[in-house]
Design a protein with these regions (language model features):
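OB-fold and OB-like single-stranded nucleic-acid-recognition modules
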Residues: 1-123
Length: 123
């Protein structure tokens, strides 16, 4: 019998223990809800993705730095970025899901249908 490994096991374990990860890669997560853009500071596109049996992460993606991701509910995405927790959010969040213009962090990204988003479009 073939055993299918969950590619998100490390992230699931971190979330269950509320451990932040400076760089995490979530693979093949389903977008379950689109949220209004976050306009506090730089403009961020936001969505909620499910990584396993009801376990969700809210994604913040800076559209001032990189082009908007053309996602819909039901889309499957790979997302790389920083995993954090906070009193302001119900779910764990992923941010820095795009290039860091200052180059101080490993570049995050979003992959949708084989296309990578999150590369810097500015100077």
């Amino acid at each position: 019998e073939e055993v299918i490994m969950n590619p998100n096991t490390e992230i699931v374990d971190a979330i269950k223990k509320s451990i932040p990860l400076k760089y995490a890669l979530v693979k093949n997560a389903q977008v379950i809800k689109l949220l209004p853009d976050d306009k506090n500071g730089p403009l961020h596109q936001r969505w909620i993705m499910e990584i396993e049996n009801g376990l969700t992460i809210t994604v913040f993606y800076n559209v001032d730095i990189a082009e908007r991701v053309p996602i819909d509910v039901g889309s499957y995405v790979d997302v790389a970025g920083e995993l954090e927790y906070g009193d302001r959010w119900k779910d764990p969040i992923m941010h820095w899901t795009h290039d860091d213009p200052q180059g101080q962090r490993k570049a995050g990204y979003v992959i949708l249908n084989g296309t990578t988003y999150g590369q810097a479009t500015g100077p």
